[in-house]
Structures are given as C-alpha cells and as structure tokens.
C-alpha cells in the first residue's frame, strides 16, 4: 500500500565535467567534493573503485556518513544490460547484452545504489521511473536520494534531482522527466537493514504520449516490470519493460 504520494524536490546544477573532474579541491591528504564533503584520499580512492565519478562528485555528507565505515571487501555489484525496448517482460536477471542502456546495483553494507547509464541518447524523453522493492524481512530508512546527470543541448554538464517520489510499505519509487541532452545517467540510493532481497528496476517511457500521471500509476510487485514496477494495465505498454536487478542483503 502507498504510504506517501507526491514529493517534488527540484534542483538543477551545472558542474564542470561529468567524467573528468573528480572533485572541487584537493590537498595532500584529503579531497573535497562538490557537495563540500571532505574525504581522506585513501578512502576516496577506495570508494571510487566502487562508485561512479558522478556519485563521488555529488555524494552528500549524509551519504558519506552512512558508507564511510562499511567493509568494502563485502561490496556486491550486479549489472544488466538491455537492447530490447518494448520487451514486455518482468525478467529479473544479472546479465543481458545491450546497445542501449545498462542497469547496475551496488550493495555496500545495506546502502544500495542503482544506476542506469544510457549508451545512446533516448529518442523519447518523457517521464521515467526508478524503484526499489524489498522483502518483508528487510527494513528501509526514510532516507533515499535520486540524481540525474546529463550533458545539456549546449554541451554543458548538468545535475538534476527533480523527482516525484512515492513511498510504499515494500519500497520506494521516483518518477522523473528525462532532461533534454545526452550522456544520461540516473541514480537511486537508499539505506536498508535486515536479511533478504532488494530488487531494483528502471522503466523508460517508450511512448511519446506517456504522461506524468501514467508514470505515477504503479505499485511495487514481483509481477511488475523488472520484478518491481507494476503499472496499471491500461498504460503499461507505454513503458519498455526492461529487466530488473536484485541483491541479497
């Protein structure tokens, strides 16, 4: 059941480079990222071996406090790739072959990050959805964060955290507008405790008539797309049905 419905958090920030600029400031023994988080270089390098440059650039102090003392030797990473847009399936997998986009999920001691990287510019840029679904044996904190990184049409690197969030008893979802531009990477992170599975899914609106209302019309279910996102049957064909990812805590 839904516990909360609409949450709109808007932020659009320019930054120097998605791929090449790792931090605002470097000293002999620390790095300060663009969110102002001061990280020892040894810790920064260890985390960078797990997370993307984008994540490291904009990791918040709250996120850093959650993950800084985790045992990185126990980090689990799974990835799927998908080339078949409109493949109406609820497949949950750990590997596919792709020319379009890749979905990755990281478990760092219960702090789970799911990221979607586009290998080519999506033709349709409407309202997409990212969501986590959890087993009943797993608990989730109220803290979660969504980010979208991209290059604008003027070739300027951008960060957007604009989303409509939905909280459910069995997880959380974020609906967001795909921004105009290229080199898109979307990211959803949340903190979990307990033992059991956490499932992740990204669903792209592959129909130009998809609306915000369509992209909000879902619940979380194992019978949904990617084993997570169950759209209203009347509008589910507007989304691409990409397979999902999962991790066992």
Where are these regions (language model features)?
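Generic low-complexity, intrinsically disordered sequence content enriched
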Residues: 9-12, 16, 51, 63, ...
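Sec-dependent N-terminal signal peptides of Gram-positive bacterial secreted proteins and lipoproteins
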Residues: 1-24
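N-terminal propeptides/leader regions of secreted preproproteins
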Residues: 23-104
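Mature secreted bioactive peptide module from preproproteins
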Residues: 83-249
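Generic low-polarity alpha-helical segments
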Residues: 13, 17, 36, 54, ...
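Intrinsic-disorder/low-complexity peptide segments enriched for small residues
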Residues: 3-6, 10, 45, 70, ...
